[in-house]
Amino acid sequence: MAEQASSFTDRLAARFAGAQIAVALPRGEVTLEVAAADWHATCLALRDELGFEQLSDLCGVDYLGYGSDEWDTADVSSQGFSRGVEGKAVGRFAWGEFPSQESSAGAQPQQLPKQRFAVVAQLISYQHNQRLRVRCYAPDEQVPVVASLTDIWPGVNWFEREAFDLFGIVFDGHPDLRRILTDYGFVGHPFRKDFPLIGNVEVRYDEERKRVVYEPVTSVEPRVGVPRVIRDDARYETAAGEVGKSETAK
């Protein structure tokens, strides 16, 4: 599998000069990272020249707080579980506040991505029995915009709508870019890391009005039940090795 991945990455490097290519071993997963300006042209070439006739999935990613944890010790502690529900980390804040990039335990983000928002597409070539992950970062995190791929793979239509709905990523050229999972009057994008876990509004039935009403959240305390933990131990040796291989491949 390693030889097959190496041969494939050589072809990608020859065709897409300047792009970053990473290989995760031993599974042989290949990731092609391109600039947002080259997103559409690269995907078109992958379909027409390299035989990736199917896009099986597309999603958005929010890297806010990436690399930060909320529980950075493996030793027995007298502080107890309270450390998991105190402090200002990503997800632990109320509406109108901005999450801290630092954990309550003092851990710092590591290997931060270039930009906050990314779009990731999973491609399949049946004729070459090959899979490929393609990623690009939106250059503007205030209004993240990348080109739509609906004219290349029509089936990506609803995937892009989902990424727009949940992350607020705008797909330029999409024929019908509107929400697909949340209400049309929904405020914000719920998969963004700065979206409060308590939400913006809560729903209840009003006896006087005889209908459902939306009101600002007042009955929910902003807290995280399970803290984010990043551990380096034997269970993650393979993953750590893959990261090393990927960095070498770049």
UniProtKB/Swiss-Prot annotation:
It is an enzyme of class 7 (translocase). Signal peptide: none annotated. Keywords: Cell inner membrane, Cell membrane, Membrane, NAD, Quinone, Translocase, Transport, Ubiquinone. One of its GO terms (molecular function) is NADH dehydrogenase (ubiquinone) activity. GO terms for cellular component: plasma membrane. Pfam families: Complex1_30kDa. Its EC number is 7.1.1.-. It catalyses: a quinone + NADH + 5 H(+)(in) = a quinol + NAD(+) + 4 H(+)(out). NCBIfam families: PRK06074.1-1, PRK06074.1-4. This is NADH-quinone oxidoreductase subunit C. It comes from Xanthomonas euvesicatoria pv. vesicatoria (strain 85-10).
